[in-house]
């Protein structure tokens, strides 16, 4: 796959995510070098990588802090050193094979994962009541299990 095709696929994924949540962002989607995004989220909010998986070759990451504030990060295909942040929220909860959080517009992002790492991202739009299957992938893993930290 050439760079133009890879970039167009990434733009399509970001467009789908943004279209699915038309009211969640007050400003633009933030993209920067991976290390800079992770450092900024850690320094500003105490967020660490808690969960991650692969979608069509792109890395999808959820960072979370101990108070449940979270961010959704997407790595553009062919640009492994870049993250984009299209969605943030609070009240990140991890249950058996399900993780979910409330976006800042009151909508809900849910990730359902199978024991073999296959996963599905679902978005419930608070304003429309619409439920969208955003994307699916493989290799989902919990880096930090907050239930074990609290026990």
Summary of predicted features, one role per range:
Residues 23-151:
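Polybasic/polar functional segments that serve as interface/processing modules
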